[in-house]
């Protein structure tokens, strides 16, 4: 989030600098410096602005260019993180602090194995947070050789968007697919199900969708079968 986004959010809420500063617990002079880019926006401030100004979690900070995002093999509560971001399948788990959807998506795609219900929620992130930082996400997916998993995720999201005649979202998702296509990997992978047996892999090769085959993934997931595609 930068000063321009902060100003736009204030105006969208029909607030003066004085009103916004009071709501966020800072002075009007300090608020003015934030909008002009003279002062950095701390994560704590952005999280408070997220609540007060009703902002999208896509404004939350992402790991720096230098730091990148690790493969994060440790156990993660992705169901809770999806629920915090509004995913209907885990709506009852909205108790965690929100994280940037792009970071949640990348970290989830880096997992060797995910609960099937969590995996089904990943295209929902791409669909519902289409304004996320795709440049950051695509770049980091390539760093970790996860562009095929990301490409398949976006393909499913695009299927859902087109099925709902949501041309604006579909256009943005197709642009992401175009950015990923040149770096598509030839090696075979799973959609976060590396523990799949040889028998299961053989079955998947015969029954996967054209999109899964295009992205060289062994999975039977299809956009039309996702619960949120039917609503």
Language-model features, listed with the residues they occupy:
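Helix-turn-helix DNA-binding elements, focusing on the entry/boundary residues of the two helices
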Residues: 6, 17, 28, 43-46
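Recognition helix of helix-turn-helix/homeodomain-like DNA-binding domains
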Residues: 24-40, 62-67
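DNA major-groove recognition helix of helix-turn-helix/homeodomain DNA-binding modules
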Residues: 42-59
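Charge-dense, extended regions
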Residues: 167-231
């Amino acid at each position: 989030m930068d000063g321009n986004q902060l100003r736009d959010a204030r105006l969208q809420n029909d607030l003066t600098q004085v009103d916004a500063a009071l709501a966020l617990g800072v002075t009007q002079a300090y608020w003015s410096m934030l909008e002009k880019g003279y002062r950095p926006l701390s994560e704590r401030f952005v999280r408070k602005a997220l609540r007060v100004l009703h902002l999208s979690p896509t404004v939350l900070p992402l790991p720096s260019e230098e730091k990148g995002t690790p493969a994060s093999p440790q156990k993660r509560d992705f169901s809770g993180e999806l629920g915090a971001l509004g995913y209907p399948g885990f709506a009852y788990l909205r108790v965690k602090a929100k994280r940037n959807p792009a970071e949640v998506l990348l970290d989830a795609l880096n997992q060797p194995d995910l609960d099937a219900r969590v995996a089904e929620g990943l295209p929902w992130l791409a669909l519902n947070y289409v304004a996320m930082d795709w440049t950051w996400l695509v770049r980091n997916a390539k760093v970790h050789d996860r562009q095929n998993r990301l490409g398949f995720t976006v393909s499913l999201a695009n299927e859902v968007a087109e099925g709902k005649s949501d041309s604006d979202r579909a256009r943005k998702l197709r642009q992401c697919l175009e950015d990923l296509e040149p770096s598509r990997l030839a090696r075979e992978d799973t959609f976060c199900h590396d523990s799949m047996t040889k028998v299961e892999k053989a079955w998947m090769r015969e029954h996967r969708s054209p999109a899964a085959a295009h992205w060289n993934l062994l999975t039977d997931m299809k956009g039309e079968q996702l619960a949120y595609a039917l609503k």
